[in-house]
């Protein structure tokens, strides 16, 4: 007759095997959710969206904790150097090939973000390892997004983090949130505070009681980006997704468009869409649904690379739809 300890051990082993099989099935579901399709004679039935939703709901608490822990880490974003032709005073050597930089004027190029000095020919071979120095990055607004997060060693621009925290702390029930404009002079004050003080800028209720000033400062930050949050390179793919009529194919195309964004842009967009999704949960109080937020943020986050004014004007409705889709499907797409 088996002992009590032996019986307990068998029970534990069976439980372990059962748990392993269950986790294996959940992992299979997650793998399948990455875009599998079922073919038919005349059309294909896309199961990507509902399957991913189901797989997401099956995530174990262990996987959730691991995901959260991973998200807390500051990623190592790649950044190309911002080289400008430069005239050096006194003798200088190339920091790439170590050879002397000859000439009296325009002897080479210098990175405006990290200060790297190289020959013009060598600049084409320098890897994308720019590490911006704060003494070269003097502003927060109108600064390239990836440059800013690398210079300050943050996951997202501090403007985005701080403004969203303040808005969610005291403004989610404010009627017309993001639609109502704040006083422009005070919004400019917030901008100057961030440029001057960085993360030490005071945007609390004691300084700015009207939450529309904070929302205005956040929108201004995105408008002032030299490269929009949804970049010029990715813009056509996002617009293409908005023109697709089939919902599942539309989401797949949108998912592909997100892959075209630089990592820092994609992370900031993910964080913003999660926030806007929470804004829509208070729609009864603030009267702002995904469609209304799309109208506000479409032209703010996206700018057409085309110089043709009429073409850019025609894209406005698709820009609105892109943001609306990102908000509604935030938990699936990111």
UniProtKB/Swiss-Prot annotation:
Post-translational modification: Phosphorylated. Phosphorylation is EPHA4 kinase activity-dependent.
Segments for region (Disordered): 1-22
Keyword annotations of the record: GTPase activation, Metal-binding, Neurogenesis, Phosphoprotein, Zinc, Zinc-finger
Record site: Arginine finger: 179
Keyword Transport: no
Keyword Zinc attributed: yes
A biological process term (GO) from this entry: ephrin receptor signaling pathway
Composition bias type Polar residues, residue spans: 1-10
SUPFAM superfamilies cross-referenced by the UniProt entry: Cysteine-rich domain (SSF57889), GTPase activation domain, GAP (SSF48350)
Tree of life domain: Eukaryota
Protein's name according to its UniProt entry: N-chimaerin
Gene that encodes it: CHN1
